[in-house]
């Protein structure tokens, strides 16, 4: 599911389509009002991730003259376009020709059918939301399970689509605290929060009490009671302002939200995996893979990129694009160079 994120930057407003789910609502997201140097939050991605070394992108695979142009697409919001551009540049560095026409083609209801029909060959996907698109409620907090279930569905779509390795990077619902609160209360995980919940003011989504992955999940897994919590739109300006203004001590945001990096807030690890895992993975049409001279090398390039990305880094890169207004291609290249994936 996608929610709308609105970043208010001075007099201008950028409306961007966000990646995480808040249980069915469509809300606006945070207003970034400070230019402080970002202090990125720890990754909330699950620990089971692919282990392909980043250097594989440079050392494994390479295009053949017979290989077709790779048509790369993505959903329409900045983070999806950024990941698509990163994958595109990594492929170009290995000699593949890339067509970017479909990057930013639209929301999943547009991009998924477009991939199935062959309008493009490759897109980054949030595996929890991708699974929910085809089978509502099937997504879990286990990225491996989400990947497997999504693959089972996509095998029968569009002549077959392959879900490659998922990244440690994930954009999903997360509970966030100010750094001073984290330090004072020694908070790193949701289990830590549970132990001191009576001492803190918690802000949750407006539908948290009736949302099974919010109120019920927090109560069952952690014993956290949100019945008296402050109800605000998750991933939205009021939640951000309440956390900044200390009206609340804990707020529900999206894990790659630029406000986290801008304010140096701390994402509490969902150590019991109550939230649907939204790790990013490339989806590739099987008919394209069948035309490549080195299918294994091609996949290794994409898997290496995915393995090198994490949630904290994606948050910072997203801030550079959506808050600092840096060009997506420039941000993508700088990160790929920092990892030795491109020169």
Model-derived features with residue positions:
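C-terminal motif of bacterial Sec signal peptides marking the signal peptidase cleavage site
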Residues: 16-19
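Bacterial signal peptide processing site
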Residues: 21-24
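Short, well-ordered beta-strand elements
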Residues: 66-79, 96-103, 198-204
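Short helix-initiation/N-cap motifs at beta->coil->alpha
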Residues: 78, 100-113, 228-241
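Short helices/loops that flank or line small-molecule/ion binding pockets
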Residues: 85-90, 109-120, 216-221, 235-251
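A ligand-binding cleft/hinge motif common to bilobed small-molecule-binding domains
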Residues: 127-139, 146-152, 242-268
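A conserved helix-loop-strand patch within extracytoplasmic ligand-binding domains
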Residues: 143-202, 307-311
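A bilobed periplasmic-binding-protein/Venus flytrap-type ligand-binding module shared by bacterial periplasmic
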Residues: 173-183, 279-294
């Amino acid at each position: 599911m996608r929610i709308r994120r609105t970043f208010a930057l001075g007099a201008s407003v950028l409306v961007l389509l966000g990646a995480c789910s808040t249980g069915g609502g469509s809300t606006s997201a945070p207003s970034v009002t400070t230019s402080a140097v970002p202090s990125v939050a720890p990754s909330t991605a699950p620990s089971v991730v692919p282990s392909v070394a980043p250097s594989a992108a440079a050392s494994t695979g390479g295009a053949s003259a017979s290989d077709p142009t790779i048509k790369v697409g993505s959903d329409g919001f900045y983070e999806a376009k950024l990941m698509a551009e990163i994958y595109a540049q990594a492929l170009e560095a290995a000699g593949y020709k890339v067509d970017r026409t479909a990057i930013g083609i639209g929301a999943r209801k547009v991009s998924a059918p477009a991939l199935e029909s062959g309008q493009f060959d490759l897109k980054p996907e949030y595996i929890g939301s991708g699974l929910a698109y085809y089978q509502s409620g099937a997504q879990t907090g286990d990225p491996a399970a989400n990947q497997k279930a999504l693959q089972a569905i996509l095998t029968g779509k569009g002549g077959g689509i392959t879900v490659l390795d998922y990244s440690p990077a994930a954009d999903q619902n997360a509970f966030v605290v100010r750094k001073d609160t984290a330090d004072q209360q020694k908070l790193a995980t949701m289990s830590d929060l549970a132990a001191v919940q009576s001492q803190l003011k918690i802000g949750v989504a407006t539908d948290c009490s009736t949302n099974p992955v919010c109120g019920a999940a927090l109560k069952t897994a952690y014993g956290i009671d949100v019945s008296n919590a402050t109800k605000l739109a998750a991933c939205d300006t009021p939640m951000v302002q309440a956390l900044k203004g200390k009206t609340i001590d804990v707020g529900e945001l999206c894990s790659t939200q630029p406000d986290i990096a801008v304010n140096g807030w701390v994402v509490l690890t969902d150590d019991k995996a109550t939230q649907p895992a939204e790790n990013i993975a490339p989806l590739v049409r099987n008919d394209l893979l069948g035309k490549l001279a080195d299918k294994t090398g091609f996949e290794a390039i994409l898997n290496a990129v995915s393995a090198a990305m994490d949630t904290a880094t994606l948050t910072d890169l997203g801030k550079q694009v959506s808050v600092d207004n840096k060009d997506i291609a420039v941000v993508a290249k700088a990160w790929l160079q920092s990892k030795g994936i491109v020169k």
